[in-house]
Amino acid sequence: MRIEDFSLKDVSSSPGVYLMKDSQGTVLYVGKAKNLRNRLSSYLQKKGDSRKRIPFLMKKTTDIDTIVVSNETEAILLENNLIKKYQPRYNVLLKDDKTFFCLSVSLEHPWPRIEAIRTRALSPGKKKQWLFGPYVSAEACYALLEVISLWFPLRTCSDREFSTRQRPCVLYEMKRCLAPCVGLCSQTEYQETLDKAVLFLKGDVRSTISNLEKAIEKASQEQKFEHAAALYRTLTLIRQTMAKQHVEKFQAYDIDVLGLYRKGSLAIVSVLSVYSGKLLGARYFIFPENAQEDSALFSSFILQYYAENPRIPKEIFVPVSLDSPELPYLLNTAEPPKIRCPKTEYGKELLALAHKNAAEQAKPFNSITPPYEELQHFFNLSQYPYRIECYDNAHLQGEHNVGVCIVFENGLFSPKQYRTFSITSHGDDLAAFEEVLTRRFRSLTTELPNLIVIDGGRNQFKRAQRILEELNLTGITVVTIAKESGNHSKSLRQEKLFCETFPQGILLHPTSAILQFFQLLRDEAHRFAIQHYRKKHAKAVLTTKKIPGIGEVKTKRLLQKFKSWKRVFIASEEELKTVQGITAKDIQRIQEEGAKPE
């Protein structure tokens, strides 16, 4: 129904769902209500809703549709389905497609191994497995694998390699595997070792930490300082990932603690995972434009998040009371979790910690206030430039030339959408920019920007305009920004902008909000370009020195550990053995290469 024709008298007082749409019919927001008439009155009546983000939503809303249901449970389920279907901008919509880092022990093999996996849920074909986690990062996951390899000598090879091996591998020589593949240990001995490793993963880390501390002390006494430092880093990671913190009062429970930070329309949700008494870490979900009440936000978030999570805890702590008592029973689990707002001191401490973590995630965005209105008027845009792309390139004397594109969308940098380009054309910066822009806009697999910003002057502006015209792309505003040579005032840089309105360029005052915003974008693009260049340059360095029989992966591992070829060649045999994948034959090759005259 058109909003100007909308009458609250015609709205049912039953439970239901409402859809707010713009003039194009796009669904902006989906909400549920116990009483549709009362809920919609809070939007339509003056001073009915005090939330700052609501006027912004209502400015864009031209139509409201309602769907009446029998009860609140139906309303929750319908709301969730409609959010998934329409993906409205102002709702909680989980776009974080990352899976979870876990450690898996497959029980289908007579000699189980522990491996790192990324999963959304238990695979149907692999029900006979134990899962440990999820862990907050890959680093934490692989650090635990490294500890297990050091202290619990279980096999790490694939099932195929296990079945075909004829003799023990180098890990057996290093006492990091019992070599069950060739029958050098009994089933009982192997199972006892596996049980100890599983006990460690369940939280019994005291003996392992004690052994690591002794190993660090021994390495220091023997002046093997690099080895001691590596062990210390491992110990630190174990303590961060496994050690019990101030949540010991809850060690009998698995708890997720949800926190929320808001600023304007920005909402950030944090999820602290407390697993068997251990605070593992947090995951964060950022919603740039959210118009839901806190209670509705958490209800919607819980329904979506735990539909994808391989583990549903026994309890979920939230900072506000939810008005959906049936919510736990809508989750796909045999044992519905308790969802509550804790009243105990420790529960409040955890909620405060979750809020603090969410607020920390907002810090990079707090200083960014895009001057959308000024941009729209200055460049005569038909709408706010919600998606902006900024381009830069980097090289050193023409070598390892790289280009990058960074994305600023809905008021936030979007690193997931950043792109890098290895430039193949040989020439000046103009040729490099032309290649990058052509490759970006020839492939229309991603959303087009409203505005593109380029680090450059008049020539870059003309080239960019020509490329967009050749590709028949309209509605994209091009701006280039360049330092004005010889025009500085007390460390405030004078910058000149080139655009369609000012093709000859215009100088903006250093305090201009538009100029400062563009400088922020350019600095981020430059940072990302330098980062990508260094990675490419480092990869090229790996190929400058080659040892016959030592591949790129092993070369990288050697240089990561020893930092230079000189230190690789003077390393002892025992030190070289600590590098993953290095065999006795490899050590012989390294020593032979190091013995050659320079």
UniProtKB/Swiss-Prot annotation:
SMART domains: GIYc (SM00465). It is found in: Cytoplasm. Keywords: Cytoplasm, DNA damage, DNA excision, DNA repair, Excision nuclease, SOS response. Residues 206-241 form the UVR domain. One of its GO terms (biological process) is SOS response. One of its GO terms (cellular component) is excinuclease repair complex. InterPro entries: GIY-YIG_endonuc, GIY-YIG_endonuc_sf, GIY-YIG_UvrC_Cho, RuvA_2-like, UVR_dom, UVR_dom_sf, UvrABC_protein_C, UvrC. SUPFAM superfamilies: C-terminal UvrC-binding domain of UvrB, GIY-YIG endonuclease, RuvA domain 2-like. Pfam families: GIY-YIG, HHH_5, UvrC_RNaseH, UvrC_RNaseH_dom. GO terms for molecular function: DNA binding; excinuclease ABC activity. The keyword Chaperone does not apply. Residues 13-92 form the GIY-YIG domain. Interacts with UvrB in an incision complex. NCBIfam families: uvrC (TIGR00194). Belongs to the UvrC family. The UvrABC repair system catalyzes the recognition and processing of DNA lesions. UvrC both incises the 5' and 3' sides of the lesion. The N-terminal half is responsible for the 3' incision and the C-terminal half is responsible for the 5' incision. HAMAP family: UvrC. This is UvrABC system protein C. The lineage of its organism: Bacteria, Pseudomonadati, Chlamydiota, Chlamydiia, Chlamydiales. The gene is uvrC.
